[in-house]
Regions:
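A short, basic-hydrophobic beta/loop patch
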Residues: 103-118, 123-156
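Short, charged/polar connector segments at secondary-structure boundaries
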Residues: 1-120, 131, 176-188, 215, ...
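Hydrophobic alpha-helical segments within soluble ligand-binding/sensing domains
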Residues: 396-418, 510-531
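Flexible loop/hinge segments that line or gate small-molecule binding clefts
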Residues: 374-397
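Segments of small-molecule ligand-sensing domains
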Residues: 527-650
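Extracytoplasmic "Venus flytrap"
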Residues: 296-316, 321, 332-340, 430-432
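An alpha-beta-alpha
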Residues: 406-446, 537-557
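Periplasmic-binding protein-like
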Residues: 354-363, 382-384, 471-480, 503-511
Length: 651
């Protein structure tokens, strides 16, 4: 390359720089490279590690160490200086060197901070190499470690450092804790597993292939990271598919998933009522005949009704639909979706048989539900879970803590020695809120009440332990059905034990799934069942006693005064004039969570990870949980981001 050609290349690079500069200015974004000195707090002590020579991903070089000549570059290090400037001449000389036999061989020197690189020496080398599309740039690197904190980005960075020890990859930089563990699991690896050189090269190639598709989207959103999009993509596609798809297929698959990619980076929306039914459909809908007079509904269950009370409760909901709507609804149930392959076959069968609304009734089915929801965007998919970040699949669950508060009040009134046993299910979202609501209910009727907490997901025999310790009032698993047989003849709900271990039922929270299913079908028949993908909303229906989805079953053996109190509490809860958590809340450690002047948000209630001051016991760690309970804790656990990744068998 001669100097005239180098001058032409500079002019082309400058035009690109000016275009980028104007676009960033118009978007109210910094048009120049970032400056590390401006990002760091001058007063904080910093640890600097000498990393040595690295091949740095070019897109990770985002700024300079000091302000210096930062104004001579656009944000991606393209040159802005006049062609007649000394800077431009040096850039052209480097351009000639790069295109010559020798090339640019000297490494740059830079600092790494939070996964990005800031050049101290070699800005023009970076500019030339990035202009020519070099994927990596050699550099001598020093790492600046931020002070540890609970800030999500800092926690995610320290997780990256553990990821880097094995992978030696800088290509992915997550900003949410737990995402590295998720990625490793989706790749079929665990934290600490060694990466071969072949695996590194393959992942880097696949990621850059995905990056091209990501940046080629018409709906590209710079607030979403490509690695976050990849994480969502891998939830419904295997890692092997990433290497086998054509560029067109990959871009199409990412476009179809895009609404869910967007919502996965946002806070999920909790709706404390069912789908809207009161809005009347417009005249156009009537003219176009789009309002159905009959709806086909499918229920896909992980187990079967003969062995699972949970499935039996949902089947009662199906029968409620048939009794309520008659000809207007066609319901079919599909059982034993106990693996992804089995679930896929059953959902496909349901669709082939005409299903328009599909309910998958177990949290573990959420990913396979998402896969089909993306594949069939005109159908409506619901998963019985909570806190799902998808716009294609709506989650639905119940505010069971409301009923737990009432059974806690009953237990407090009935506990003669002030001690009450409580058997928790699993440490998943919403369960600590139920534990605490029960404890607060007990305090309302007995200010001396002490709750002894045990867990059914851990080793041990809680009921036998309580009996041996002299505890005679116990709260156990919730009644899954409106059939009172469960409460009267089994160890469900809250009950007393006599001195021989006999059970006397008192009350239990009850799931009434038919109420929710009725709301959905009414909305569909009215033509008002909305498509949340249009508004990029991740909707989670979280319904309480006011909706009828949650209720309390009261035993005929309750003393009349206690029953009257429970009826009054139930009425207040249904009218939403009673909030169990609108009071002073103090943890076991004496920390005041709230002074009672406000309502806790749905997010605070679902992610509650503390126990009330009158609870003895603790929330179990993942290692303490029995293997049979670990899958649900991985899916919905309150500490799921801290759980080691599990290898995906189809990665």
């Amino acid at each position: 390359m001669d100097f005239i050609e180098a001058k032409e290349e500079y002019a082309a690079a400058q035009r690109r720089a000016q275009k980028e500069y104007k676009e960033l200015l118009a978007a109210n974004k910094d048009p120049n490279p970032a400056v590390l000195d401006e990002l760091l707090d001058d007063n904080s002590a910093r640890v600097v590690q000498d990393i040595g020579l690295l091949e740095i991903p070019a897109e990770r070089i985002v700024g300079t160490r000091a302000a210096g000549r930062v104004s001579t570059f656009s944000a991606s290090f393209l040159p802005l200086a006049k062609p007649s400037s000394e800077f431009a001449v040096k850039w052209m000389n480097l351009c000639q060197a790069h295109m010559g036999e020798v090339g640019i061989r000297d490494p740059i020197t830079c600092y790494e901070y939070l996964g990005n690189f800031y050049v101290e020496e070699g800005n023009k080398r970076v500019s030339v190499l990035r202009y020519y599309g070099a994927p990596c740039i050699a550099g001598m690197v020093k790492r600046i470690l931020p002070a540890r904190s609970d800030e999500p980005r800092i926690k995610a960075y320290y997780e990256f450092l553990e990821f880097y020890k094995s992978s030696k990859l800088y290509t992915v930089q997550f900003r949410r804790p737990g995402d590295y563990a998720k990625l490793l699991g989706l790749l079929g690896k665990e934290l600490g597993d060694p990466w071969s050189e072949d695996e590194r090269r393959t992942f880097s190639a696949y990621f850059h292939y995905f990056l091209d598709a990501f940046h080629g989207l018409d709906v590209f959103d710079k607030d979403i990271l490509p690695e976050e999009a990849l994480l969502m993509w891998l939830k419904i596609h295997s890692y092997k598919e990433l290497g086998s798809m054509t560029a067109t297929q990959l871009r199409k698959s990412l476009t179809e998933l895009w609404p869910d990619v967007v919502t996965s980076t946002k806070q999920a929306e909790f709706v404390e009522a069912g789908p809207v039914t009161e809005n009347k459909p417009g005249i156009i809908n009537w003219i176009m005949n789009s309002i159905p007079d009959r709806v086909h509904v499918a229920f896909v269950h992980q187990l079967d009704a003969a062995t699972s009370p949970w499935v039996l409760g949902h089947e009662e909901g199906r029968r409620h639909l048939e009794e309520t709507f008659g000809y207007q609804v066609v319901c079919r149930s599909y059982f034993n979706a106990n693996s992804d392959d089995a679930a896929a076959l059953l959902i496909e069968q349901a669709i082939d048989e005409g299903a328009q609304i599909i309910f998958t009734t177990a949290p573990k089915l959420n990913r396979i539900t998402l896969k089909f929801a993306v594949k069939y965007p005109k159908l409506h998919f619901f998963n019985c879970s909570v806190d799902l970040p998808y716009s294609s699949v709506r989650a639905y669950y119940g505010r069971i803590f409301e009923a737990k508060f009432i059974t806690g009040a009953i237990a407090g009134a009935m506990a003669q020695n002030d001690r009450i046993g409580y058997v928790g299910s699993n440490p998943i979202v919403g369960v600590p809120a139920s534990n605490n609501a029960f404890a607060l209910g007990a305090l309302m009727t007995n200010p001396r009440a002490q709750i002894e907490l045990r867990w059914s997901c851990c080793e041990g025999t809680p009921q036998a332990d309580f009996f041996r310790d002299g505890i005679r009032v116990i709260s156990n698993r919730d009644v899954p059905s409106q059939n009172k047989m469960y409460m009267e003849f089994c160890n469900y709900g809250t009950y007393q034990m006599d001195d021989r271990g006999g059970l006397i039922p008192l009350a239990s929270p009850v799931w009434v799934w038919g109420k929710f299913y009725q709301i959905v079908v009414e909305s569909a028949l009215a033509g008002t069942l909305k498509d949340d993908k249009i508004n990029l909303r991740a909707v989670n229906y979280w319904l309480g006693m006011d909706s009828g989805v949650i209720d309390v079953s009261l035993s005929d053996r309750l003393p009349i005064g206690v029953r009257m109190m429970a009826e009054l509490l139930r009425k207040s809860m249904r009218e939403r004039t009673l909030d169990p958590f609108r009071r002073k809340l103090t943890t076991q450690d004496g920390i005041v969570i709230s002074d009672g002047s406000r309502r806790l948000s749905p997010d605070e209630l679902l992610r509650m990870d503390w126990l009330c001051h009158n609870v003895s016991g603790s929330i179990p760690s993942f290692d303490e949980i029995l293997p049979m309970s670990r899958s649900i804790v991985r899916e919905l656990g309150i500490y799921k981001d801290q759980i080691p990744a599990i290898k995906e068998t189809n990665a």
